[in-house]
Design a protein with these regions (language model features):
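PP2C/PPM-type serine/threonine phosphatase catalytic domain
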Residues: 1-176
Length: 176
């Protein structure tokens, strides 16, 4: 997990929801016919509000409360057949559930206590990994279930990146 805090002038404010422009799209690529990747773009209020996802079951909650955090997750299924898609779907659903359920911790979190928050994200990733392994062992023909996971969590003015596997993320600063 990596945490960044931008050196911001004091006049810079937290962006409003309508000032955040994001988009997600998945594609099967050139090798496989089936798409094994999934994504989620959401904001965390008192509950998670899904803005866009490749998974239709992750419906949005619409409440007009102050945004606590912004979440973007990509799960890139590994391997052929159904196992990669199922692994990426399961990982994305599980990690978003953990993050969404923990939204209340943002109200009580100490702004200077990043270590506790990092440990919580790491624990969530490990729980998803363990659950995916258990699921893989329990389902015949799914022993090779695997996925990468890249998670961005913006809690103004900090960002947290959780990287599991070999998928890349690109960090731009000052347009570069």
């Amino acid at each position: 997990i990596r945490e960044e805090q931008a050196a911001l002038p004091s006049a810079v404010r937290k962006p409003r929801d309508d000032e955040i422009d994001v988009f997600g799209l998945t594609h099967p690529g050139k090798v496989r016919d089936e798409n094994q990747d999934n994504f989620l773009i959401a904001s965390l209020h008192r509950q998670m509000r899904v803005h866009l996802s490749s998974l239709p079951a992750l419906g949005g909650v619409t409440r007009d409360t102050d945004r606590l955090a912004f979440l973007a997750v990509v799960a890139d299924g590994v391997g052929g057949g159904f196992a990669g898609e199922e692994a990426s779907r399961f990982a994305l659903e599980s990690i978003s559930q953990y993050v969404g359920d923990s939204a209340q911790c943002f109200y009580t979190a100490d702004a200077g206590d990043d270590e506790t928050f990092r440990r919580t994200l790491e624990a969530a990733a490990l729980r998803v990994h363990e659950e995916l392994n258990s699921r893989s062992e329990a389902l015949p023909g799914r022993r090779e279930m695997a996925t990468t996971l890249t998670l961005f969590l913006g809690v103004w003015p900090r960002i947290y990146l959780l990287q599991v596997g070999d998928s890349r993320y690109y960090f731009m600063r000052d347009g570069i």
